[in-house]
């Protein structure tokens, strides 16, 4: 399994495409010998291994691939010869060229990499995805999304990088330029938590139902003034209280669904604060604004655990008791050791399994399967940060 970082455009590329000699490592020169078998001067090749094992090159190739009706003794003889010659296996580039595939899955992380990797949600989903792709001998190319206010800019890698399948994390808007760019190239795509689109596989969770469940939990505790701290509405990534006009149509699907979950419980939020990213400091900023006024809410539903933990820290900073003065709930189910002794009330999603599910869809696509939609369940975990509404 190889995990390729964001490509370094300062690295010079080969002036010409690889030839069969480049791929197989056949470099002219005085041959060395192994038991009477001529060897390449720089490194052993599959042909050298086949000669040493006294089998055909095709048989040696099948011995490494694990395919075909090859006797166990023959396979072992090939591997023994390879070990003695120091041959590590067929060149991956050559194998990719023969298959007509790059062996690479492009993963668009949905944000600047420096910000995305501060969120355990991203890393846990990637763990599940990369873990499954590793069993398929596929590499991963990480591609950041445009992080500025424009919705028309996409990373040049999306237009040029070799990839067999693309995975788009945190799908964004239905008219995403990322999806449009991948469609132009004809690259099969798996979308994580985005709007259903023709020809695109989608892996989602019942986040709308999960938010409805945690909101009803707060209603059962007697809360009536319930506010919301949200993920970004769109590429503008604003930071502040929402106007009625902006609330009307969030472009990003995750934000839209989780807001809808509050309404499904019969609640119109007392206030909605949009944050530019799922980070603790943005939750703390939102918490200070929402909890400083005279008509502060008695409960706050946050669209991520990192945002919720920031609100908890802001409440403590303002001298408010959680949950006696204000109840706070999140979404994700990640570890938040800095909140101890409190345990956040949250909606738990199966992060690693979500990534593995995406990996299985990638596998299915490479096998010729049609696009499909899979939705994973979520569960409410009641912690110590929610309690009865203050009198």
Enumerate the language-model features and the residues they cover.
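Bacterial carbohydrate/catabolite-sensing allosteric modules
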Residues: 1-39, 84, 131-135, 183-391
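N-terminal helix-turn-helix DNA-binding module of bacterial transcription factors
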Residues: 1-101, 390-391
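Short beta-strand segments enriched in small/hydrophobic residues
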Residues: 59-61, 97-114, 225-231, 243-248
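Amphipathic helical "hinge" segments at domain boundaries
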Residues: 80, 88-155, 165, 260
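Short beta->alpha connector loops
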Residues: 111, 146-149, 169-175, 195, ...
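Short, well-structured alpha-helical segments in soluble
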Residues: 151-162, 284-294
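Short, Asp-centered acidic motifs that coordinate Mg2+ and/or phosphate
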Residues: 164-167, 299
């Amino acid at each position: 399994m190889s995990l390729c970082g964001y490509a370094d455009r300062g690295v010079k590329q080969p002036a010409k495409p690889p030839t069969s000699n480049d791929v197989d490592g056949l470099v002219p020169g005085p041959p060395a010998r192994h038991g009477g078998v001529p060897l390449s001067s720089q490194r052993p090749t599959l042909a050298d291994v086949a000669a040493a094992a006294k089998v055909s090159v095709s048989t040696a190739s099948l011995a490494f691939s694990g395919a075909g009706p090859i006797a166990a003794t023959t396979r072992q003889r090939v591997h023994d010869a390879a070990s003695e010659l120091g041959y590590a296996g067929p060149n991956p580039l050559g194998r990719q060229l023969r298959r007509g595939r790059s062996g690479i899955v492009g993963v668009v992380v949905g944000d600047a990499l420096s910000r995305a990797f501060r969120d355990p949600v991203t890393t846990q989903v990637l763990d599940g995805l990369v873990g499954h792709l590793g069993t398929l001998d596929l590499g991963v190319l990480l591609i950041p999304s445009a992080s500025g206010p424009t919705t028309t800019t996409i990373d040049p890698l999306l237009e040029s990088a070799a990839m067999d399948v693309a995975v788009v994390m945190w799908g964004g808007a239905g008219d995403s330029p990322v999806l449009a760019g991948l469609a132009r190239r004809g690259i099969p795509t798996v979308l994580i938590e985005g709007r259903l689109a023709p020809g695109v596989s989608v892996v989602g969770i019942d986040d709308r139902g999960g938010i409805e469940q945690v909101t009803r939990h707060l209603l059962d505790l007697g809360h009536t003034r319930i506010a919301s701290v949200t993920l970004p509405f769109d590429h503008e990534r604003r930071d502040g209280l929402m106007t009625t006009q902006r609330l009307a149509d969030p472009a990003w699907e995750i934000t839209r669904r989780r807001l809808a979950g509050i309404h499904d419980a019969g609640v119109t939020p007392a206030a909605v604060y949009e944050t530019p990213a799922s980070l603790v400091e943005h939750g703390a900023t939102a918490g200070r604004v929402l909890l400083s006024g005279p008509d502060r809410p008695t409960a706050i539903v946050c669209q991520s655990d990192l945002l919720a933990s920031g609100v908890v820290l802001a409440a403590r900073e303002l001298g408010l008791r959680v949950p006696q003065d204000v109840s706070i709930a999140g979404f994700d189910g990640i570890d938040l050791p800095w909140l101890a002794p409190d345990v956040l009330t949250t909606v738990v999603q199966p992060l690693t399994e979500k990534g593995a599910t995406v990996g299985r869809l990638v596998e299915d696509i490479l096998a010729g399967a049609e696009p499909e939609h899979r939705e994973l369940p979520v569960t409410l975990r009641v912690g110590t940060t929610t309690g009865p509404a203050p009198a």
